[in-house]
Amino acid sequence: TVNILNADRMALLPKGAYVVNVGRGTAIDQDALIKALDSGHLAGAALDVVVPEPLPADHPLRKAKNLLLTPHVAGNMTLGYTCERNVQLFCENLENYAAGRPMHHLVDRRKGY
């Protein structure tokens, strides 16, 4: 499964597709992903897993267009309190967004996280 989503397979995706990986960092050819994002073939991507982890500050993924990186937090939703807390935060943020109020845990783009 290493690089199962490679340049050839990304080319088969429709223009404007999105790629999401919450499984294994090795499943995606990251160089091919960067090229597909930068060329505009892919509209965006979200990665919760990357190679290496943690991702170095100067890694090319950090400069890729339309890429959302999360810090490997998509795991173990089977723990009751984790699931409940995530749902609670999502609902609160949805209500806050709809009402024009500040949301919890926003990314500070100036800081990069």
Question: Model segments located where?
Answer:
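Rossmann-like adenosine-cofactor binding region
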Residues: T1-P60
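C-terminal helix-to-coil terminal segments
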Residues: V51-Y113
